[in-house]
Amino acid sequence: YEWDIETRLDALPPGGHEIECSEFGQDGAIYDTYAEGGVRITAFKVLHCEPQNTFAMKVEYKNRTFVFSADTKKCDSMLHHALNCDLLVHEAFPPAELYAAKSNRPLEVAKKISEVYHTSPREAGEVFAETNPRMAVIYHMYNNDDVIGPALEQIRENYQGPVEIGYDLMVI
């Protein structure tokens, strides 16, 4: 990697970039982590794996709202913060049966992973129906054709609005 390092040092200072960090606790509070130039970023706790869980993010700018779920289950904090947002990017793990087959895991293990620690496509459809985003996107999904179809079918059991399957480098 020597050539890469030398090339970068020709153009950039060796110290790199400074990082400004906002630390916050795990008490479930809502944190305004950034507010500048009309942009407001809020972190809020969502359910993933007790006791650590994860934090979702809500970005607001010029009367537009984007919410990113992080790894989570359906939970009240997500329903509250994503209500009527413009774009909700929410995780949805593959349907348990397909996940078990693709990962060579027992069905019981696959169900725990996809339905206890993560959001199933069916449950993501419930979240979308209850929050009414202008656009919904799911991620954390195998993007194989044999998975996308069943996942969308499960989402459509509860939600008829606009939904996309996220993929790397997707532009919305």
Residue map of PLM features:
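Cap/insert and terminal regions of metallo-dependent hydrolase folds
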Residues: A56, N63-T65, K73-M170
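Binuclear metal-dependent hydrolase catalytic cores
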Residues: Y1-V67, K73, P150-I172
